[in-house]
């Protein structure tokens, strides 16, 4: 085992063009069990990551004597071809971590789940927004252009998953899910403006102000924010939560003490040296506020108990912070084509980010820590929270 790992490490540094390692069935089984055990021990994450990656490579490199439907024959060999280590670094680090952070939930086909929920949210959004030909057509076209630009719909999907975790119905949570997608999109439209981040691309295509002009983009953002409250007003109150509570939660999350507060702090931090606490304030408000409140309102739509709401609030807050740390990492590790927006813009604008303050590796560790915190917040729930666990892992592993 030591020899195999040593050869793999040497190859990953580019010292060997090709390595052939003879592996027997007992070794594979031992490695699998050891990886599963080590991955749960505090302070051993890096070893678990290495073992997990090695096992994956072995399992996908079938030797010439592999019997049909079985493990490779002991006499088989597995070519470990030279790896582009840097291209695998982000995916390997987070995927192996995600697999270990919460092993107790049942597997969820996250691709199928996201696609299904995205369709549900998009149908509802299409019904809530005025059609593109409704007068004044320009503003409604601009709203729809930005809203239906192919976003991942993570906030509304988390809202729906939170409702299901509390035993609620998707239909009751949909108004909140759609409202917070409108608020999120409004913030992006305004964030891309020349007076803010001055970005030309969003979600893989020209930003709203590049297509419709700056004035219409400002108004489209305003309209998306205000229609969010109209959509919330269509939700049904529950025994524990009134319409006033729904509207107040929405207003606070999008207002000057949360989302706007984060935007202001972000602008004021440009070009300055900020502390980690100051950066956390930006992330808590600019990103985590909307994400965590969408989770809270999903729970409220299901008439969540006080304990359930508190647990999901902790989950949403930790996940929102992890989401932004990953965003910071992706800005310096991915291409514009991959992200669908301008890569490296945070560095160019001298923005405060986790990689800039604590470094890339420490940022990855922080993202994992926050994701684990999100998983731990869900211990109150059983299988009904499997989708939330899967979504947390998905956000940790994402590459754009």
Segments and roles (model prediction):
Residues 106-128:
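N-terminal amphipathic/basic leader segments beginning at the initiator methionine
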Residues 6, 12, 40, 44-45, ...:
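Intrinsically disordered, low-complexity regions enriched in polar/acidic and amide residues
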Residues 1-33, 51, 87-91:
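Intrinsically disordered, low-complexity segments enriched in glycine and mixed charged residues
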Residues 28-94:
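Polybasic, low-complexity intrinsically disordered segments
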